[in-house]
Amino acid sequence: MDSTNMRSGMKSRKKKPKTTVIDDDDDCMTCSACQSKLVKISDITKVSLDYINTMRGNTLACSACGSSLKLLNDFAS
């Protein structure tokens, strides 16, 4: 048996694509619904706040998808 006959019955494996994780300095939180980036408190002076939709209390609305964002401790109350 030569090597070509042995390979004919075997499934060929596809190589997984290499993924690289880019660790940005501007790591910021993302919206859990649409994954758009949210403003960090340290960047508050650099960003125009006209697009932030405040709802009631500590709840914000994501300007990209409209979902409501609130603190985790607000879920208990």
Swiss-Prot record:
Q: Which UniProt keywords apply?
A: Host cytoplasm, Host nucleus, Phosphoprotein, Virion
Specify where it is mainly localized: virion
- Top-rank taxon, per record: Viruses
Compartment annotation: Virion; Host cytoplasm; Host nucleus
The UniProt entry, under InterPro entries, shows: Poxvirus_A19 (IPR007769)
User: Short name of one Pfam family for this protein?
Assistant: DUF678
Q: Where is this region: Disordered?
A: 1-20
Q: Which GO terms describe its cellular component?
A: host cell cytoplasm; host cell nucleus; virion component
Query: What is the recorded function of this protein according to its Swiss-Prot or TrEMBL entry?
Result: Plays a role in the maturation of immature virions to infectious particles. May also participate in viral transcription.
Q: How does it assemble?
A: Interacts with capping enzyme RAP94/OPG109, the two large RNA polymerase subunits RPO147/OPG105 and RPO132/OPG151, the two early transcription factor subunits OPG185 and OPG133, one of the capping enzyme subunits OPG113, the nucleoside triphosphate phosphohydrolase OPG123, two core proteins OPG129 and OPG138, and a virion protein OPG064.
Concerning its family, UniProt says: Belongs to the orthopoxvirus OPG146 family.
Q: What is this protein called?
A: Protein OPG146
Q: Which gene encodes it?
A: OPG146
